[in-house]
Each structure stands twice: as C-alpha cells, then as structure tokens.
Amino acid sequence: MFENLFSLKGKVALITGGSRGIGRAIALAFAEAGADQVVSSRNKRPPELEKVVEEIKARGKKALSVPAHVGKKEDVQGLVQKTLQTFGRIDILVNNAGANPVLSSMIDLEEDSFEKVLEVNLKGAFLLSKAVAREMIKQGGGGRIINMSSVSGLRARADGTGAYCISKAAMNMMTQVMARELAPHNILVNAIAPGSIKTEFSRVNWTDPERKASRLREIELKRFGEPEEVVGLALLLASGAGSFVTGEIIRVDGGMTI
C-alpha cells in the first residue's frame, strides 16, 4: 500500500540552482525516485551542470541542462519553453537558485547589492512560479512548487545578512499566498527552510572561525547539516507522501530555531 508513496515515476521536475549543493542532491534523489528533469543554473557553471545531467542519466532517467538567470524574464521564459519542448509538461518546480548574502549592515548596504539579492531570491522564484503554475493549470492534474527558503527568513539577524533575510521572509509569504491561490487547482506550494547546511553557497559560515563558532552555538545538534539531509523533505513535498501539505514553511535546521 505504501511502497510507492515517495515515487516520482512519470513526473517531470524543473530544478533551478541544480549544479551543486542542495539543488544537486535533490536532483539526484528525484532521479532515483523516477523523475525526468531539467536542471538549471547561471551561465558561469556549465561543466558542473552537465555533470549533474550525466549523473541523472546514469540513474536511468532523462535530463536536460539549461543555463538561465532566473531574475531575467526572458531567461525564465526560455527555461520553461525548453522544458515543455523536451518533456511536454512540468509536474514539479524546485526554486533553489539563490544569490549569496551581501555582508553589510542595512544602513551601509548599497542599493544595487540589495536589488541583486532580491532579484534572484525573490523575483526569480516569483517569475518562475508564475510561469510554471500557468502551465500546470493548463495541464490539469495539479502540481508541486517547492521554494528553497531559509531559517534566515524566520528571524532577524544582525550579522550583515539583512538583505538575504528580507528576501527569504518575502519568499515565505509568497509561498503561502500562492498556496491559497493555487489550491483550487491542486497545485501545492511549500517552502523548505534549511539552517546551516555545509554547501559552497554558505562557505563563509563554516570556514570563518568566528562565524562557525557562532553558528554552532545556535544549533542544538552542534554540527552543520549536509545537503543530503534536505532531500527527504523535498521528496515528501514532491510526491504522494505530501499530498495534503500546502502553504507550509518547514525547517531543516538541527534545532537551530527551537
């Protein structure tokens, strides 16, 4: 009865920020669960992106890489169209692309730096969710949108990551608004809020001795998480196991925000 609960067989997933870290881990897990995929990242990492495509294919699934800047409307349109041209549908969207925090207090933060963070972390997720949701409605049968947020969007920090915190807090509200709007179409929208995960994206948090010590004091499990430890929740939200879950912001943080 429950053996196929986490199966993604016959599904097509679109994953941004898929070249490394959490995005790559989710892509490989989705492949093992049965999903064909389009993985995307910005143009500066095509070799890493192609490697992920080969890893997906090695697991017996179809895959396509599409470099794109999700903050650019024309790139988003191209990404969605290439996915549809290749696979004919989109069942799952994972908005994982993100801009690194700009380390600055709010009063010293430059306007262009603030806009850069919001362009990718918020605007990008908005543009892609909007475009993909429209296709899901046309397709019928529902769909899943998973936004990769952060515990930084759940509480204010005074460590120079203010713009990042703001972008993720806004993403959380967007998640819940879209969950309500899209519920009549059985499109489920949720967010995952990782804590301190050991990725290149957050390298400064686990390589700088002072920041590392500060983070470890906050984490009840007293260690950084690994990208693979986010995968289980992503599978739940993408599969039949999460069919009655929508509008949630779910933390994966080792007890950081208890």
Q: What positions do the PLM features span?
A:
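Conserved glycine-rich cofactor-binding loop
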Residues: 12, 19-20
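Conserved glycine-rich Rossmann-like NAD(P)H-binding loop of the short-chain dehydrogenase/reductase
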Residues: 35-50
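Short, small/polar-rich loop/turn modules that mediate ligand/substrate recognition or access, typified
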Residues: 89, 183, 188, 245-247
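Substrate-binding pocket helix/loop in short-chain dehydrogenase/reductase
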Residues: 104-106, 110-118, 215
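Active-site helix of classical SDR
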Residues: 129, 167, 175
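Alpha-helical segment proximal to the catalytic Tyr-Lys
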Residues: 134, 180-184, 243
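Residue(s) in the substrate-gating loop at a strand-loop-helix junction
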Residues: 150
